[in-house]
């Protein structure tokens, strides 16, 4: 870090989003204690984990995982809320980096040559100003060195929020929602 950054942090210190403690050099968004306390699933270490099973019969997948457990009122919810509704894009990139760092140990990314974030409809992207999936993907791309492309998959129509829908209604809501764009060869 430069002396100017250190001086800036002296007068305008960054604090942990979860506990409020002042961040020290090298920490971003979360302090080490809160970062290490996030509830990891370890699903990437298990073949046929619950996330993979959820896709069976719906779409073909090689492997799938969920990085953190989500609980109402929990720390993961707070981070996602900060990313999605408070415009804190740095949260997404930090979470993407953290996830990629842990998944790389299990060879999860072997054979993957492109990171494609889930696209938002243009209307929603204009309203929000960014795509939170892109923030996560950017963090994954930085750690893995796998390039990210935001133009190969598009969202073909606008959909209402899925927040209050059940699992079946969510699947129905996104049926035929995405399309691949193949560049001219």
Explain the meaning of each model-derived region.
Residues 1-185:
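Glycine-rich phosphate/pyrophosphate-handling loop used in enzymes and phosphotransfer proteins
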């Amino acid at each position: 870090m430069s002396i100017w950054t250190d001086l800036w942090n002296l007068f305008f210190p960054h604090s942990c989003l979860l506990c409020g403690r002042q961040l020290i050099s090298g920490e971003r968004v979360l302090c080490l204690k809160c970062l290490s306390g996030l509830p990891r699933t370890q699903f990437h270490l298990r073949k046929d984990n619950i996330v993979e099973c959820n896709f069976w019969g719906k779409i073909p997948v090689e492997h799938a995982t969920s990085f953190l457990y989500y609980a109402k009122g929990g720390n993961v919810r707070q981070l996602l809320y900060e990313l999605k509704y408070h415009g804190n894009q740095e949260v997404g990139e930090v979470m993407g980096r953290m996830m990629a760092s842990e998944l790389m140990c299990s060879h999860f990314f072997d054979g993957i040559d492109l990171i494609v974030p889930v696209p938002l409809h243009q209307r929603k992207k204009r309203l929000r100003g960014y795509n939170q999936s892109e923030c996560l993907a950017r963090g994954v791309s930085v750690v893995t060195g796998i390039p990210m492309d935001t133009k190969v998959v598009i969202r073909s129509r606008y959909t209402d929020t899925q927040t209050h829908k059940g699992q079946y209604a969510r699947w129905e809501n996104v049926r035929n929602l995405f399309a691949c764009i193949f560049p001219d060869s």
